[in-house]
Amino acid sequence: MFFSRRFFPFFMTFFFGAFNDNLFRNALVIMISYQSGLPPDEANARSFIAMGLLMLPYFPFSATAGQLADKFPRHTLFRAYKVMEFCLMVPVLFAFLRGSIWPLLALLFFMGTQSALFSPLKYAYIPQMLEERELLRGNAYVNAGTYVAVIFGAVLGNYLITVPHGRLLTGAVILLMAAIGLCGAFLIPRMPAEAPSLKIDPNLFRASWDVLKSVFRDGILTHCVLGLSTFWMTAALYVSLLAGFCKDILHAQPHLVPIFYLLFSAGVAIGSVLCQTIGNRRPVMPLVSPALVLMAIFTFDLFFAARSWSLVPDDPDALFSIAELVRHPSLWRISADLVLLAACGGFYSVPLNALLQHKADPEQVARAIAANNIVNSFAIALGAVATAQLMARGIIGTVGVFVLVAAVNFLTALYLLPLRKERLPRK
């Protein structure tokens, strides 16, 4: 299935889009922080703006994106959105060459808008083009591919912008990735529109309210959406905390951060693929809550491993190299916890995505995905704001966040218990 005409061009299309989003954003953050010459407070403020601009468009535009993906043939929209992305990347290249921060921030917002339009289309494509028995496998590949693209894009963005001629290389790679994604979009097979008579609501906020109401009227869809929101909030918190965790808790040089990013993404990918492998042999919905409980256990162990970290440099300003850290057994324990909790997250999120697509009305599946995106974005923002407030007031530290995350995971496991009786089509 993976290399079939109905899946592989689609995989290329979304993979390089997610890769580009995160390469662009992280390269811009590094450029602002290290190369802009701005005062630290102003540089930090613009970095936070950059981190938020990519997610902000999901709130107003997701519902309209869902309506468009239900009304029009999806192969046409794939091509239109990838043409939009390629056209955006041309000025991005020149803005990077000039080192123009504000134009890059504006272009990042437009890139986020393109991603918000693309996301419901991506997940609505799966149940339309794949057979029901392939839903679990398709979602496993999409989940693994998305997270690998996000992390590799982030790591490459952090690296490219710092090498000689880094701005030129960053802009050129972004343009090249957009071109590859565009080629993939034109290879996606033609398909009919699911709801051609649907009227597009021009009022963005009313449209958002309508798609949210339609999803929350259904108990199963509500459980899926809130369960997935926990996954994305947790993942966003880990990615945000890893740099500070490495510096302040492990006293490690910055080179450890991308390694932890890679371990986390590898864990999500492993869990996603493991889920579809098990799903070929037995029902996986009964395993969703146990996977979340295991995720909470590994998160608690990460908390205790960090609390017991005893390697502290003699010089308060010194940081340990990776070669020095690998001799410390606790680093291996922390690394294992990170991979295993990420694998549990990948495992439990795949069947929730598949069940959401399976249970939604075929004519409304893109709008159900749009509602999911809105709630996911809200959960990510809520988690970030709540954590920042708790840390700013000294209520918790970096390590204390792990306890909160573990508690949320455990409560979510209890909340998702009613889904254990649901069944997905199997091979």
Per-region residue spans from a language model:
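Hydrophobic alpha-helical transmembrane segments
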Residues: 101-108, 112, 137-195, 267, ...
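Substrate-agnostic recognition of the 12-TM MFS/MFS-like secondary transporter fold
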Residues: 8-25, 51-88, 103-162, 223, ...
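C-terminal ends and interior cores of transmembrane alpha-helices
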Residues: 83-99, 293-327
